[in-house]
């Protein structure tokens, strides 16, 4: 099967937004116009095409990024739908990693919202070019130019309108295209639009003013254009388009479009802008990887002739075909039935079938080419972030980084039958989502699940029930505390057991010191003269690493410390790896009295958006939760309070905020850093954990 669309006619895009900015509806409409859907599904009725998991349809939010293929004007557009809720930012990161460009959807009434900022930051980190679609222009209070100004004020983005709405709220009836200098009117809510017309007289001045500031903004990024502009020469439409494209691809400029996806206005123009301004796989820098043997950096060009390389960016369990692995092909081609190398795990994998996904239906294809996004059936060992490549020409592409979970919940199966099923279900869910972890507490035997927030874990439990038919009782959420040392000391660990016959002997001297925040555990071997033989060093390091997991104060993992092994002794007959492993863990226990261990708790960066009149109550509430208010600003007619609050104090905050603001307040939070727990509180936690 030959390539259907050339590389320069391929677009891999994501649609990113705040909750409720209308992202799923926008995606829906795109699929509708590109001929993939026959009846439009409304998110309000819970029947949207992209939101195909049952919980998404019930909650009306998008959780998993389904990858869909569509066609528009002879181009292939692969769309990755990304979730807008902060508990799912890993999904967003994971999809941004494999896209080439994105459409950021804003709500015309609120402009840039807290989650938009988070997602925007992530897109900037990955250098993703963006166009912006100001949606919901038909909504009461919609204000296009205000929304454009929020992009500049809150995100410091060089964003300029390339369209202007004709009318607003229920009078929104058309769109002026500032690039082509024409107007389109919509004749009904089904998106039937007039041919290009002249700009209405009452909009001429505004349109000209905005067009001039657009030309000025892109001319600043292009010297040739700047000269023409300064000399007062006419800048042609193709020149203007080329300059907007160049600025957008360099992530220096963001064109802003307008419309109402719900009322089918402006979506076709968004599709045109995707083709005009967002990159093809050949426009973005070729992906870099490293050779597994030599760690040498190599570049994989985005062509069909290059060796095959791809990144698995999502693993899902499908009710019909089992495990589905979504992957993005960066170079080369892959035929179904062939073998590939998973270079991240050094395993050989067979690709059974290759499917091209439409939100919830699929089409089997025989070959995928560079730049394509597809799903493979039959990969056994591949998980999110792994590289798949040619067996003869291996490479490891840079993987994705996932944040550590911050919240733990104990979970118990309701019956014996559920017990066995629960293990399988949790393993499959953890395979799909790298920010979800599951472990068994060795002392209590309880199963603990950890995730990014309460909603994240709610949905996991919900999926166990629905997809795996596992009934479980869920405990109260627990905070993932950590421990660390505040001072250093030299400590001895000695393990001797002589009881006739062969004994055990391990003896070490280790210097412990606090490490920088976030630097993790560092082990240094400073033994000279072989006082501890070389073969026992790994056992000493392993002994320390195992003991770190259970901490020294209250059983929480010990982080950010340095350990330097500088002395010790051994016995010719009695020493073995096990003895040194135990000696190392004894040294760590002995460090408790000398190294001033403290308890750390996750601090959340919280942003609360509330109407002015509730300001006093909310500030008081944050302070009562041991929070520090770090700033506030007016945003439209609302107030935004930014604060740092310990996660342990944020449980149930959603409910309390609702009751404090009559349901008008919203908040977002994400983990920022770890901070020492105040002494009185840490004593309580230690007591509770030691069961006193």
UniProtKB/Swiss-Prot annotation:
CDD domains: EF-G (cd01886), EFG_III (cd16262), EFG_mtEFG1_IV (cd01434), EFG_mtEFG_C (cd03713), EFG_mtEFG_II (cd04088). The keyword Protein biosynthesis applies. It is found in: Cytoplasm. GTP binds at residues 17-24, 81-85, 135-138. One of its GO terms (molecular function) is translation elongation factor activity. It comes from the Bacteria. One of its GO terms (biological process) is ribosome disassembly. InterPro entries: EFG_II, EFG_III, EFG_III/V, EFG_IV, EFG_V, EFG_V-like, EFTu-like_2, G_TR_CS. Residues 8-282 form the tr-type G domain. Keywords: Cytoplasm, Elongation factor, GTP-binding, Nucleotide-binding, Protein biosynthesis. GO terms for cellular component: cytoplasm. Gene3D superfamilies: 3.30.230.10, 3.30.70.240, Elongation Factor G (Translational Gtpase), domain 3, P-loop containing nucleotide triphosphate hydrolases, Translation factors. The keyword NAD does not apply. Catalyzes the GTP-dependent ribosomal translocation step during translation elongation. During this step, the ribosome changes from the pre-translocational (PRE) to the post-translocational (POST) state as the newly formed A-site-bound peptidyl-tRNA and P-site-bound deacylated tRNA move to the P and E sites, respectively. Catalyzes the coordinated movement of the two tRNA molecules, the mRNA and conformational changes in the ribosome. Belongs to the TRAFAC class translation factor GTPase superfamily. Classic translation factor GTPase family. EF-G/EF-2 subfamily. NCBIfam families: EF-G (TIGR00484), PRK12740.1-3 (NF009379), PRK12740.1-5 (NF009381), small_GTP (TIGR00231). This is Elongation factor G. It comes from Bacillus pumilus (strain SAFR-032). The gene is fusA.
């Amino acid at each position: 099967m030959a390539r259907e669309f050339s590389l320069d006619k391929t677009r891999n895009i994501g649609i990113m937004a705040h909750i409720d900015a209308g992202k799923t509806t926008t995606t829906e409409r795109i699929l509708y116009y590109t001929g993939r859907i026959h009846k439009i599904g409304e998110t309000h009725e819970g029947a949207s095409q992209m939101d195909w998991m049952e919980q998404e349809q019930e909650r009306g939010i998008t959780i998993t990024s389904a990858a869909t293929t569509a066609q528009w004007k002879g181009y292939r557009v692969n769309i990755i739908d990304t979730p807008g809720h902060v508990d799912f930012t890993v999904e967003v990161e994971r999809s941004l990693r494999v896209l080439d460009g994105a459409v950021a959807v804003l709500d015309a009434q609120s402009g840039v919202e807290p989650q938009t900022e988070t997602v925007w930051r992530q897109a900037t980190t990955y250098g993703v070019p963006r166009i912006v679609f100001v949606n919901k222009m038909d909504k009461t209070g919609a204000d296009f130019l205000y929304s454009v100004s929020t992009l500049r004020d809150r995100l410091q983005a060089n964003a300029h309108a390339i369209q202007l709405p004709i009318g607003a709220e229920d009078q929104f009836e058309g769109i002026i295209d500032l690039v082509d200098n024409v107007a389109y009117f919509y004749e009904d809510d089904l998106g039937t639009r007039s041919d290009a017309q002249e700009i209405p007289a009452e909009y001429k001045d505004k349109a000209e003013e905005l067009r001039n500031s657009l030309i000025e903004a892109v001319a600043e990024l292009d010297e040739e254009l700047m000269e023409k502009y300064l000399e007062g020469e006419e800048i042609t439409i193709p020149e203007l388009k080329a300059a907007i494209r160049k600025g957008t691809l360099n992530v220096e400029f963001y064109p802003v479009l307008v419309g109402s996806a719900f009322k089918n206005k402006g979506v076709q123009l968004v599709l045109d802008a995707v083709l005009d301004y967002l990159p093809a796989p050949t426009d973005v820098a070729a992906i870099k990887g490293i050779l597994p043997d030599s760690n040498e950096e190599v570049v994989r060009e985005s062509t069909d002739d290059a060796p095959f390389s791809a990144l698995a960016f999502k693993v899902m369990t499908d009710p019909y075909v089992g495990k589905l692995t979504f992957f993005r092909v960066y170079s080369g081609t892959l035929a179904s039935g062939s073998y590939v190398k998973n270079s991240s795990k050094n395993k050989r994998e067979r690709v059974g079938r290759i499917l091209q996904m439409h939100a919830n239906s699929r089409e089997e294809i025989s070959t995928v080419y560079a730049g394509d996004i597809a799903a493979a059936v039959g990969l056994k060992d591949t998980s999110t972030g792994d590289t798949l490549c040619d067996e003869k020409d291996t490479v490891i592409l840079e993987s994705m980084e996932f944040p550590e979970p911050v919240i733990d919940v104990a979970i118990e199966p309701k019956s014996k039958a559920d017990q066995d099923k629960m293990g399988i279900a949790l393993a499959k869910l953890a395979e799909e989502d790298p920010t979800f972890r599951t472990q068994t507490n060795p002392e209590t035997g309880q199963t603990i699940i950890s995730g990014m927030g309460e909603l994240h874990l709610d949905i996991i439990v919900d999926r166990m029930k629905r997809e795996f038919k596992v009934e479980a009782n869920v405990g109260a959420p627990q905070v993932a505390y950590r421990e660390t040392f505040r001072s250093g000391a030299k400590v001895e660990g000695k393990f001797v057991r002589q009881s006739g016959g062969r004994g055990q002997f391990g003896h070490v001297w280790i210097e412990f010191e606090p490490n920088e925040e976030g630097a993790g555990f560092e082990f240094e071997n400073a033994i000279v003269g072989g006082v501890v033989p070389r073969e026992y060093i790994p056992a000493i390091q392993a002994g320390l690493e195992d003991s770190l997991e259970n901490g020294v104060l209250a059983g929480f993992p010990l982080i950010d410390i340095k350990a330097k092994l500088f002395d010790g002794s051994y016995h010719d007959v009695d020493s073995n790896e096990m003895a040194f492993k135990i000696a190392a863990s004894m040294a760590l226990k002995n460090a408790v009295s000398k190294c001033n261990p403290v308890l750390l708790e996750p601090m959340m960066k919280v942003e609360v958006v509330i109407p002015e009149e509730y300001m006093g109550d909310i500030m008081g509430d944050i302070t009562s939760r041991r929070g520090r208010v770090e700033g506030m600003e007016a945003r439209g007619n609302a107030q935004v309070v930014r604060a740092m609050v310990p996660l342990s104090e944020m449980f149930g905050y959603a409910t309390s905020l609702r009751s404090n603001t009559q349901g008008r307040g919203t908040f977002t939070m994400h983990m920022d850093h770890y901070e020492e727990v105040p002494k009185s509180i840490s004593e309580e936690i230690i007591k509770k954990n030691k069961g006193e």
